[in-house]
Amino acid sequence: MKILITGSAGMIGSYVVKELIAKGHTIVGLDRRESDWKHENFIQVALDLADKKALNDVFENENVDRCIHLAALAHFAGENDLSFERFKFVNVTCAENVFEACALHSVPVLFISTVDAIGMVKGVITPETELNPISNYGKSKAMAEGRLKEICQKWNIYRFSPVYTKTQKRDIEKRYYLKYPNWAYKIGSGEKFEVLEIGGAVKSMVDWVDKEVDNSIHIIKDAELLDVNTLIQREKAEGRAKHVLWLPRWMVVCGYYCIRAVFGKSNKTYLVFKALWPFRTIEG
């Protein structure tokens, strides 16, 4: 197959490109910058997804079979503008351009969303759980999910748990570090979190290429929970986490409700909410 991947030069995208090429597929990679990695079956196109004409030209010229839409504004490193308008432009408006091109050319699309689109929800979560996003990232991804359903005839949505590699843990470290690499923390007896190792994320997308596109939503996560106690012990063994602050759960819960009384449902309260009531998801 010839598969179009947006965000092909990003952390996740670069892994997916290599794995799909190893499976014998041809990849059309769209990104604002070209990857340093080259292959005869890797067609790189440097463009901005806001450029509708350039985007549609790629679809016209390359005759792709499927699309994986990975490109997004997610993590904050190096970003100066974190307004909702910026998130909406990148994650909704640019996504709409991709979805419209897919619909025009009858290309099935896999949209990579996030569990942050679910938001502040307690209890067991399924793909059918009503969304209550709080963060700008989660709100924009939830909006994009809605637009995908309206625009495209054939689609799937994969809501990824936080993705990590051995060397890049991104926002996972927030769950056990106050200040990396020396000051760790744990709440109560230590929480367990749903996360997603890069290999599992890549496998889910590679497998999708050979599956029937059935307009369904799936939550993608590791089979095992991330145990904060085990993780801190591992960090200490490697010379990090020299100090571990233990926070009684009751104290953090009280703090959460005090913060919420002042700020309501906001990014500040959402971060504490996720630490106290980690997601527990099932396929439904």
Question: What is each model feature region?
Answer:
Residues I3-K23:
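N-terminal Rossmann NAD(P)H-binding glycine-rich loop of SDR-like oxidoreductase domains
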Residues M120, N132-N156:
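Active-site Tyr-X1-5-Lys
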Residues L49-V90, A101-L104:
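NAD(P)H-binding glycine-rich loop region in Rossmannoid oxidoreductase-like domains
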Residues S204-S266:
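Mid/C-terminal beta-alpha module of Rossmann-like enzyme folds, strongest
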Residues E40-D51:
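Rossmann-fold cofactor-recognition segment
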Residues K154-G200, D207:
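NAD(P)-dependent short-chain dehydrogenase/reductase
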Residues E96-N136:
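Conserved Rossmann-fold NAD(P)-dependent oxidoreductase catalytic core, especially the SDR/UDP-sugar
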Residues A50, R66, R86-N97, S135, ...:
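Glycine-rich NAD(P)-binding loop of the Rossmann-fold in SDR/ketoreductase-type enzymes
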